[in-house]
Swiss-Prot record:
GO biological process, one term: biotin biosynthetic process
Residues passing through the membrane, by range: none
UniProt family annotation: Belongs to the radical SAM superfamily. Biotin synthase family.
Name the UniProt record assigns to this protein: Biotin synthase
Alphabetical UniProt keywords: 2Fe-2S, 4Fe-4S, Biotin biosynthesis, Iron, Iron-sulfur, Metal-binding, S-adenosyl-L-methionine, Transferase
Pfam family, one: BATS
Catalyses which reaction(s): (4R,5S)-dethiobiotin + (sulfur carrier)-SH + 2 reduced [2Fe-2S]-[ferredoxin] + 2 S-adenosyl-L-methionine = (sulfur carrier)-H + biotin + 2 5'-deoxyadenosine + 2 L-methionine + 2 oxidized [2Fe-2S]-[ferredoxin]
MF (Gene Ontology): 2 iron, 2 sulfur cluster binding; 4 iron, 4 sulfur cluster binding; biotin synthase activity; iron ion binding
Annotated function: Catalyzes the conversion of dethiobiotin (DTB) to biotin by the insertion of a sulfur atom into dethiobiotin via a radical-based mechanism.
Binding site for [4Fe-4S] cluster: 74, 78, 81
Residue ranges annotated for the Radical SAM core domain, each copy included: 59-284
Binding-site list for [2Fe-2S] cluster: 118, 150, 210, 282
Subunit structure: Homodimer.
Upper classification of the organism: Bacteria, Pseudomonadati, Pseudomonadota, Alphaproteobacteria, Sphingomonadales
């Protein structure tokens, strides 16, 4: 099969004449993916935009809302995370929220224009009992609002994945963060294989996967692309691929990480779009640090979802009024 990044002129002509030409692949190699990532930026964005328009409505953007339903005290030692109990961070720990309160906030998010409601709990893994039952109630309540429901709860077993599916869960977020070679530099309390096994259990239960990563962790471009190769090797591809920029937080090991050129997130989004053309590519954490122009480049390169709201778990997000003005200026519909 001819790849998006290396197809011949005849292959490109055929694709342009026939929008239904299949370009979805699961056999990406690291070297060819790196070659795509390192294309001249304008060529990379142009190719990604062409694929984006072939598979998606370029005039539509999904708004998602994200809520921390249980904050702080996580036993994992992820180097970027303010919620880890291993780090000396000024953060107020909060117990699991009441389902009624969560569903009420979901209703407000829907009224503000959000289509998907995401809920995050700072757990290593799900434990059966009252708290998990409460999360299932939250999911059912969000779905009753005719919203998509996504949760991130840590590791799950097969039975828990089944119960999440029965509650109507739309998607489960479990990020790979970076490539497998660099992953041990970020966290030591679980392995890359642990992440992949949880994703497999979620997929086996029939729940859509939301899994992506973070740039700015001290990784190399090769590490970033290595993660994309892992994701693009999943058949089918993840339904959602969030792309985050590190938000340095005082007290975490990565508080003083060197900043990344914002155009690197544009490259990441464009490469993800080319490698996983049918997936939702979500411009996620760190967006508040990007200029208006860089955000527009991300959308042109293939991002078709943003988080809408002033806070993402424990980090700031882009201003809602500024988002409204940006979307109006672009002339895109968002929900």
């Amino acid at each position: 099969m001819v790849s998006v990044g290396t197809q011949s002129h005849s292959g490109r002509d055929q694709a342009e004449q026939n929008p239904s030409v299949e370009n979805v692949r699961y056999d990406w190699q690291l070297d060819e993916a790196l070659a795509i990532y390192n294309l001249p930026l304008l060529e990379l964005i142009g190719r990604a935009n062409s694929v984006h328009r072939r598979y998606h409505d370029a005039g539509h953007l999904q708004k998602s809302s994200l809520l921390s339903i249980k904050t702080g005290g996580c036993p994992e030692d992820c180097g970027y995370c303010s919620q880890s109990a291993h780090h000396d961070v000024e953060l107020t720990r909060e117990k699991l929220m009441n389902p009624t309160a969560v569903i009420g906030l979901a209703a407000k998010a829907k009224k503000a224009g959000a289509e998907r409601f995401c809920m995050g709990a700072a757990w290593r893994k799900v434990r059966d009992g009252k708290e998990f039952d409460a999360v299932l109630e939250m999911i059912r309540g969000v779905r009753a609002l005719d919203m998509e429901a996504c949760v991130t709860l840590g590791m799950v077993n097969e039975d828990q994945a089944r119960r999440l599916a029965e509650a109507g869960l739309t998607a489960y977020n479990h990020n790979l963060d970076t490539g497998p070679a660099y992953y041990p530099q970020i966290v030591s309390t679980h392995s890359y294989q642990d992440r992949l096994e949880t994703l497999a259990k979620i997929r086996d239960a029939g729940i859509a996967l939301c899994t992506g990563g973070i740039i700015g962790l001290g990784e190399s471009p090769r590490d970033r692309v290595e993660m994309l190769v892992v994701l693009a090797g999943m058949n089918p591809h993840p339904e959602s691929v969030p792309v985050n920029m590190l938000v340095p937080i005082e007290g975490t090991p990565l508080a003083d990480a060197d900043p990344v050129d914002p155009l690197e997130i544009v490259r990441m989004i464009a490469t993800a779009r080319l490698m996983m053309p049918q997936s939702m590519v979500r411009l996620s954490a760190g967006r508040s640090t990007l200029s208006r122009e860089t955000q527009i480049l991300c959308l042109v390169a293939g991002a078709n979802s943003i988080f809408y709201g002033n806070v993402l778990l424990t980090t700031p997000n882009a201003d809602m009024a500024a988002d409204d003005a940006l979307l109006e200026a672009l002339g895109v519909t968002a929900e």
